[in-house]
Amino acid sequence: MQLLGIGMDGHIGFNEPADHFVKATHLVDLHESTIEANSRFFNSADEVPKQAVTMGMGSIMGAKKILMIVNGKAKKDILMDALYGPITPQNQASILQLHPDVTVIYTEE
């Protein structure tokens, strides 16, 4: 079971929008928007790591089941694009359309 959330830009894990999907687990440079979103967990934005290790899409898609939990009206449009729009690395979550067993739980709160 793979448990996921989705970022405001469609990223899952730390797989940020890109020009291609990365299959393997890898080191990434975090986008400023991700650093800013995670700064609430630190005393200042300067303390937020600038890089992270993330599962790649091959690792995520290899899960038998995927559960994605999405909270907030602000993520509704990117979620709808991921679920019903084109499959594109610009919205990394869109690749989940190809997985045979994905459950999405969405709340507007």
Predicted features along the sequence, with ranges:
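Conserved phosphate- and dinucleotide-binding cores of soluble alpha/beta proteins
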Residues: M1-E109
